[in-house]
């Protein structure tokens, strides 16, 4: 099961006692700030959680899996996430749910 933005908003509503509308706006604002920073070429560092980094990938040769034809994969910028040590540690200690 995946955590959704709606569930995050509901959790903020229940734990902080703010209105559902404010909780939804807070979640949206958080993600918009992350998006805006990445669009501007900035790294996003969330202490105790991890870092969102930008990586420029060079053009490289590829192959169409259906036809076997060689095709170039164009250069592009990708977002990567590196979890912080605290997050890694907590995930390692967590018991898997079935």
From Swiss-Prot:
Pfam families for this protein: Bac_DNA_binding (PF00216)
Region entry Disordered, spans: 52-71
GO CC annotation terms, alphabetical: cytosol
PROSITE patterns, per the entry: HISTONE_LIKE
TM segment ranges: none
Gene Ontology terms, MF aspect: DNA binding; structural constituent of chromatin
SUPFAM superfamilies (alphabetical): IHF-like DNA-binding proteins
Keyword annotations from UniProtKB, A to Z: DNA recombination, DNA-binding, Transcription, Transcription regulation, Translation regulation
Listed GO biological process terms: DNA recombination; positive regulation of metabolic process; regulation of DNA-templated transcription; regulation of translation
Superkingdom field: Bacteria
Stated family: Belongs to the bacterial histone-like protein family.
Job of this protein: This protein is one of the two subunits of integration host factor, a specific DNA-binding protein that functions in genetic recombination as well as in transcriptional and translational control.
Assembly and interaction partners: Heterodimer of an alpha and a beta chain.
HAMAP family associated with the record: IHF_alpha
PANTHER family given in the database record: DNA-BINDING PROTEIN HU, INTEGRATION HOST FACTOR SUBUNIT ALPHA
Name of the protein this chain belongs to: Integration host factor subunit alpha
